[in-house]
Amino acid sequence: MLAPRNTETGVHMSQTEADLALRPSPSLTSMGPTRLGPPPRRVRRFSGKAEPRPRSSRPSRRSSVDLGLLSSWSQPASLLPEPPDPPDSAGPMRSPPSNSKEHPEGTWTGAAPVKAADSACPELTVSSGGPGSREPPRVPDAAARERRREQEEKEDTETQAVATSPDGRYLKFDIEIGRGSFKTVYRGLDTDTTVEVAWCELQTRKLSRAERQRFSEEVEMLKGLQHPNIVRFYDSWKSVLRGQVCIVLVTELMTSGTLKTYLRRFREMKPRVLQRWSRQILRGLHFLHSRVPPILHRDLKCDNVFITGPSGSVKIGDLGLATLKRASFAKSVIGTPEFMAPEMYEEKYDEAVDVYAFGMCMLEMATSEYPYSECQNAAQIYRKVTSGTKPNSFYKVKMPEVKEIIEGCIRTDKNERFTIQDLLTHAFFREERGVHVELAEEDDGEKPGLKLWLRMEDARRGGRPRDNQAIEFLFQLGRDAAEEVAQEMVALGLVCEADYQPVARAVRERVAAIQRKREKLRKARELEVLPPDSGPPPATVSMTPGPPSAFPPEPEEPEADQHQSFLFRHASYSSTTSDCETDGYLSSSGFLDASDPALQPPGGMPSSPAEPHLCLPSGFALSIPRSGPGSDFSPGDSYASDAASGLSDMGEGGQMRKNPVKTLRRRPRSRLRVTSVSDQSDRVVECQLQTHNSKMVTFRFDLDGDSPEEIAAAMVYNEFILPSERDGFLSRIREIIQRVETLLKRDAGPSEATEDALSPQEEPAAMPALPGPSDAELQRSISPEQRSWAAFSTSPSSPGTPLSPGTPFSPGTPPVFPCPIFPITSPSCHPYPFSQVSSNPCPQAPSSLLPSSSGASQVPFPSPSLPTSSPLPFSPSYPQVPLHPASLPTCPSPPPLPSTTAAPLLSLASAFSLAVMTVAQSLLSPSPGLLSQSPPAPPGPLPSMPLPLASCDQESLSAQTAETENEASRNPAQPLLGDARLAPISEEGKPQLVGRFQVTSSKEPAEPPLQPASPTLSRSLKLPTPQLTSESSDTEDSAAGGPETREALAESDRAAEGLGVAIDEEKDEGKEPQIGGSSPILSQPSPVWMNYSYSSLCLSSEESESSGEDEEFWAELQNLRQKHLSEVEALQTLQKKEIEDLYSRLGKQPPPGIVAPAAMLSCRQRRLSKGSFPTSRRNSLQRSDLPGPGIMRRNSLSGSSTGSQEQRASKGVTFAGDVGRM
């Protein structure tokens, strides 16, 4: 027991000694009495919690530092003999061990390191430390709480919306996810769908108001775009951000980065990934370009192609921002130079710029190198791009297929680049769906049925299709659908239902590829057929339009360079074609107005109001005197003069053409047309310009605010017109402004126009002698809201009489129109024929029922279209046709017109058909008295009415006209003017030059004397029914009705007012023309196709020289004509039947005269200019006019004449004796 005590005592003593050594104040002797009572308790308190922390911790720290020293001191003290202690001191010395049971042994020695550790880890002292021991852990706890508080505040900030859309649907959070040069993108939320969106703020402070408005309109257009490869546009609005106006776009949120970030991360793109993503980009571009109007991205690059994480597909983004970027930074960098096509620098671009940018994107994806990275600045890039130098990275492309595609996309000439459709059908981008469709037999390009093979890949044979296990099927173009064929295969068990979509897609793509190939071959053939530019195009393929199954796209042929002022315009306002007419403009009255330059004398030859005007209800006979080439003026010159074009290279006025080759010269030049006129708020005219490089530019100008000089300067600056064309463009714009102002004034006072229509004598005097577009051309472009009353067709009327808004109009109801009024003036004073014909009903009742088939108006009897909107259209080969003194009643006031006069001024109630124009090559008669042999047009039955004749005897006119008709009817088999054919010209006789046209006259029959006839013509006029079936005619009519007898024809002829140049030719059978009304020339000719006699339908001297005497050419033309006749007839019959079925299904009664859409399509007529056009465009430009009800017209302007009366009768077309005959 003593040893432990000694040990414990030794330990205790060593501790005490240590304390004493550290504390120099008290001695050991003085400590004895102090340890009698309280010291042990103090020792216990020292080990307990009573002592303050400084006293308890200080020894602990010191013992830990001096542990080794204290241990060394305690060891010798235990070995030395102890001095004798007082007996009373043993108790206190032993008291600590007695109390040491509460604390384990070694509390002071062994606990010393523990306390040292506690000093390093304060949290361990909490269990035994004093009150101050909680302080050290409180410091890190506060920092953690601060961090948690900041995190919560940040989360609250991020989840709290800082802005909302005007409708409250979209929320903006203050989380920036992207920033560009002019935009900042934040995270947003669609509260309706709870889908995150991208909130884009676009700075527009540098934009003008017009540019801002334009961009807003583009964004509005982009909202409706939904495609899997297009970033969705949800909404947009204007907002004010920090006092600045900005545009906010809400788009689909793309969180997986862009192609640019992908290339930075992976550097190299695998071929299959390149193929798949490139195909998806192409699909997105194809979707944009197939919109109407096409949407151009204009800033396509890898930074704007986003990747969707879940599906791994790509989407094209930043749509519509290129315009804004160009406007904002026009003075620095326009777009992204590395991806900009050469034409982008000129700001003249189309869909091809996106193809160029796509090629650069593919180049970057294939090489992971930025295009033109070798260039130091944008100027070097510009020089390389415009010079056609490819970037250096192009030569690093390893895959030949990819290199070929890139090369085809980045060509300098945009016309040589691939199209999106070409790229989608390229083998590299073709999807492997395990289904292959191929032709079972070679395609000849003609058969409507395709024999195809469907092969399915066999997984057991390495993906190769099985041999001799193809499914052969027949696909009818235009009738079968790929989905229907695939469904039939599924129903028959040939393919499984899971393969329905791949099979349908494969069939659809193969058929589309075959059709594209056929179209290319067809165009190539047409280009081969086209003659050289030295001469006019022959009337071959250009006159054989295909069956008009649907409205074709508008051909790009504006009118600024129309080198002939046609006297006849298209006057159709049917609801089907009113918004898609090409150039058939109308005046407010629907016909040529008095201010039409085609009806005016040239400059320096003013019209004389004192000249008497002979009012002819339907027509009058004309003599055909021989006219030598030395005549001062010819109708050919008048007809072909380019008064309507400010850019004309033709002579003005009555000057004769010195160089006929110059007339039909072709060169690239701008063409201008008026598309719309609006006077709702501002008087705005919209025009369409075809530039010298065949680009279409649509522009508008204010009649009051814009000057022609400013417009011309802008056009020259933008290189839309050449500087050499500026003067012509200026004059053209001035003429358009004058015509539009005249038209708008006339529209403002229709009642005045109606009053003016009653006085035809005053009208020609007011005609300004200004060449330019006629008011008739501008009328069609008047907006429908201003022309709600304009849905009428061409019909005779007094001039300037507008159709009242309440006038009912339907295709089957024949409107009642007054007879046309024609001023007959002296040829010496009026080289241009006048026409005061209007298509609107005159308020007066003395009007005859003159039906018209132009537009939608139909006549209830078998009569071809009889529009009266044109005077006599003189074809290039048409001879001069002055009035014969004996053929028409002469008035006391006008001097007699000698037969030797070279330029008679004629205005007929209806223009001659193309048959007359083409036959006119042989119409030049040697004697001036040939009028009696010209059969007048047999008019239709008209109610009795007084015929207004200006200072002329109506009875004498009727008598003389009837005499002519009797004479003509008595010689039905006698050839009128010989065998007249369009080409080859095989008539005998020396060709003579009429104006600038070479005309050959063959036979000159004797001139029979005129015989008196009954004057009953004035009481019963019959409607002229021109059955025009010459080479140029497109009116092979088939009507319900039996053939007319010769007597009925003669009676019909006697009722005419003497249109004397009625000739019909029968080229196919080689027959002589029948005089007894075999091809009576219309007093109401078909309005539209007469326009084409000048440029392509009749042989002028140039055409004769260039085209030659090729018989095979015309034989082929005849075959094409017959083919198209049958196709159009079948189509029109089918469409008419479908319309009747539709009416029956709707429970309505079909209207009396149903016109099939194919027939209405023929109203889309435009005048042909001298410009060089491919044959396909000429096909689309030449379509016949609407036939009358019951008349089935063939839409072919080509072929030979088959116009004998017997042939017409065999085709069911008759000249009705009265209105009710059908």
From Swiss-Prot:
Question: What Gene Ontology terms for biological process does this UniProt record contain?
Answer: aldosterone secretion; calcium ion homeostasis; cellular response to xenobiotic stimulus; chloride transport; distal tubule morphogenesis; ERK1 and ERK2 cascade; gene expression; inflammatory response
- The protein's role, per its UniProt record: Serine/threonine-protein kinase component of the WNK4-SPAK/OSR1 kinase cascade, which acts as a key regulator of ion transport in the distal nephron and blood pressure. The WNK4-SPAK/OSR1 kinase cascade is composed of WNK4, which mediates phosphorylation and activation of downstream kinases OXSR1/OSR1 and STK39/SPAK. Following activation, OXSR1/OSR1 and STK39/SPAK catalyze phosphorylation of ion cotransporters, such as SLC12A1/NKCC2, SLC12A2/NKCC1, SLC12A3/NCC, SLC12A5/KCC2 or SLC12A6/KCC3, regulating their activity.
Biased amino acid composition, Basic residues: 659-672
Processing and modification events after translation:
Autophosphorylated at Ser-328 and Ser-332, promoting its activation. Phosphorylated by WNK1 and WNK3. Phosphorylated at Ser-572 in a MAP3K15/ASK3-dependent process in response to osmotic stress or hypotonic low-chloride stimulation.
Ranges annotated as biased composition (Basic and acidic residues):
135-152, 1044-1056
The entry's ATP-binding residues are: 181, 251-254, 301
| The protein's required cofactors | Mg(2+)
Q: Which residues carry this modification: Phosphoserine?
A: 95, 328, 332, 572, 1014, 1196
SMART domains xref list: S_TKc (SM00220)
The activity regulation comment is:
Activation requires autophosphorylation of Ser-328 and Ser-332. Autophosphorylation and subsequent activation is inhibited by increases in intracellular ionic strength: Cl(-) potently inhibits WNK4 kinase activity via direct binding. Also inhibited by K(+) ions.
Name of this protein: Serine/threonine-protein kinase WNK4
Alphabetical UniProt keywords: ATP-binding, Cell junction, Isopeptide bond, Kinase, Nucleotide-binding, Phosphoprotein, Serine/threonine-protein kinase, Tight junction, Transferase, Ubl conjugation
Composition bias, Low complexity:
627-638, 792-809, 845-873
Region (Interaction with KLHL3) location: 554-564
- Where is the cross-link described as Glycyl lysine isopeptide (Lys-Gly) (interchain with G-Cter in ubiquitin)? 154, 172, 183, 223, 238, 325, 384, 390, 447, 451, 990, 1123, 1136-1137
